């Protein structure tokens, strides 16, 4: 319940909303402060015969500000028994033509929602991806291109903007057949296209190795103790000029931390969990090896433990 000023009570009082009547009442004196309000959220109850093919909902779904026809609408149909009434059929064609502009967006949003669900992404990322695609559509820049690659690229960019990055390889798994190269090209195209709009540039943000750490560790079922050590180690690794991608650094830090524990993970396991090739992990290990004593947390591994690690 929220508060509002009641003209009868002459003070701020709690409000009671009667959804069935559409009235907002003062909780103390019962004065109707607002009447006949429309609830635009989805209908929860149905009243039609369940065996009927008609839609049992009296009100449509929640409004979507990205759609032109998202407000409450009226359906224009032919009169009962009419086979070709000129007026009603003309109005019907006009209505269908008016709603066509949203059909492509609705399909795009459905596909993005499905991809987002398969990746386990939060709603804010899905909504941001929808916004990116809507901006492309407004500029008529999505036509003639691989739509699945565009949807996937919008999700990739949205993840980065929301500081929940995913690798292109992870995105590729749910991209309905779009390849890494196609998604990469689509991503570059979106950044270039939307960046041309004044004040509307696409800021991808900066990816850090730590952004992937918890998810990769979870994929490997690492202990909380090891996860904490890996997160601390990857933060310390940023102090050195290690010219490797954040994903590669995350993978090699996990390899180092697990080799210092009783629950060792093979390069194959880490490669499968992170999507980084075994050869890349080996080469990254060579770059981090000289800094092991400064990267590995002292509470997790002693100097003697570090000396027992294999040399590259």
UniProtKB/Swiss-Prot annotation:
Pfam families: TFIIB (PF00382), Zn_Ribbon_TF (PF08271). GO terms for cellular component: nucleus. Zn(2+) binds at residues 6, 9, 26, 29. The keyword Transferase does not apply. A zinc finger (TFIIB-type) spans 2-34. GO terms for molecular function: TBP-class protein binding; zinc ion binding. It is found in: Nucleus. GO terms for biological process: endosperm development; pollen tube guidance; regulation of pollen tube growth; transcription preinitiation complex assembly. SMART domains: CYCLIN (SM00385). Sequence repeats lie at residues 115-192, 216-290. Disruption phenotype: Embryonic lethality and aborted seed when homozygous. Belongs to the TFIIB family. This is Transcription initiation factor IIB-1. The gene is TFIIB1.
């Amino acid at each position: 319940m929220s508060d509002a000023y009641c003209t009868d009570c002459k003070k701020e009082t709690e409000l009671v909303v009667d959804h069935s009547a559409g009235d907002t009442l003062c909780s103390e004196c019962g004065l109707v402060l607002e009447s006949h309000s429309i609830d635009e959220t989805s209908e929860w109850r149905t009243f039609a015969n369940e065996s009927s093919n008609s839609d049992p909902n009296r009100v449509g779904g929640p409004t979507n500000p990205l759609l032109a026809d998202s407000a409450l609408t009226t359906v224009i149909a032919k009169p009962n028994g009419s086979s070709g009434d000129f007026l009603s059929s003309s109005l019907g064609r006009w209505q269908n033509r008016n709603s066509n502009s949203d059909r492509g967006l609705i399909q795009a949003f459905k596909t993005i929602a499905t991809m987002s669900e398969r990746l386990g992404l939060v709603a804010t990322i899905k909504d941001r991806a929808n916004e990116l695609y809507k901006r492309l559509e407004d500029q008529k820049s999505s036509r003639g291109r691989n739509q699945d690659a565009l949807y996937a690229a919008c999700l990739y960019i949205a993840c980065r903007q929301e500081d929940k990055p995913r690798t292109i390889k992870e995105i590729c798994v749910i991209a309905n057949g779009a390849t890494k190269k196609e998604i990469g090209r689509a991503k570059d195209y979106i950044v270039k296209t939307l960046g041309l709009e004044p004040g509307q540039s696409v800021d991808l943000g900066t990816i850090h190795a730590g952004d992937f750490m918890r998810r990769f560790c979870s994929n490997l079922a690492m202990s909380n103790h090891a996860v904490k050590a890996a997160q601390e180690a990857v933060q310390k690794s940023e102090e050195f000029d290690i010219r490797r991608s954040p994903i590669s650094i995350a993978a090699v830090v996990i390899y180092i931390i697990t080799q210092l524990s009783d629950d060792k993970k093979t390069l194959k396991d880490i490669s499968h969990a992170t999507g980084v090739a075994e050869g890349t992990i080996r080469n990254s290990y060579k770059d981090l090896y000289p800094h092991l004593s400064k990267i590995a947390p002292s509470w997790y591994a002693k100097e003697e433990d570090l000396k027992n690690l294999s040399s590259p």
